[in-house]
Amino acid sequence: MKPRRLLLKSLPLCVCAAWALPLLGGCDSAAQAAPQSRFVVLDGSSKTTADFKGKVWLLNFWATSCTTCVAEMPEIISTYNKYQGRGYDTVAVAMSYDPPSYVVNFAQQRGLPFWVALDNTGELAKAWGDISATPTTFLIDKQGRIVKRIVGKPDFAALHLEIEKLL
């Protein structure tokens, strides 16, 4: 095949890959400000993104019906326990299709030590980029900028290195 023809045939694939990689968490683009959001937590209180200014924090969109979400939860707990005394926090947002009673039961049974919020209306998932795949996890820096978006289970060793750099 001629080099020019090969280039023309591969160009659409390269464009698609360049567009899709950031969406899939395959590479980091410039940090952007986290959307201003209000999280209604299980105890009925609320937190906002402004409450986390000055902290490094993890935002995890998950569901009790998501096997990957359930499997990664012990590592999210471990990460929270490891860094929470150093200016780190975590918010786990249950998707709108997750029955609140299931979320409450899950959080109580596993003793989740961090903020667990309900997204009853789907507004949070929409505000954070029309989240539909779970788990989807964001790492936010002390200035409130999204520094990483991960679709699927994070590489927790790499995530810990990133958290260490940001703290």
Residue map of PLM features:
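Short active-site neighborhood of thiol/selenol oxidoreductases, capturing the structured segment around
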Residues: T49-T67
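Hydrophobic beta-strand core positions in alpha/beta domains
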Residues: L58-N60, A92-A94, F138-L139
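N-terminal secretory signal peptides and thylakoid transit peptides that target proteins
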Residues: M1-C14, A18, P22-G25
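Short loop/turn microsegments at loop-to-beta-strand junctions
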Residues: A34-P35, W57, T134-P135
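Short, ordered coil/turn segments that flank beta-strands lining enzyme active or ligand-binding pockets
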Residues: L42, F52, K142
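N-terminal "domain-start" segment that seeds a small globular fold
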Residues: G25-T49
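Structural microenvironment flanking redox-active thiols in thiol-disulfide oxidoreductases
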Residues: V70-R110, N120-K126
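Thiol/disulfide oxidoreductase modules built on the thioredoxin-like
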Residues: Q108-P113, N120-E164
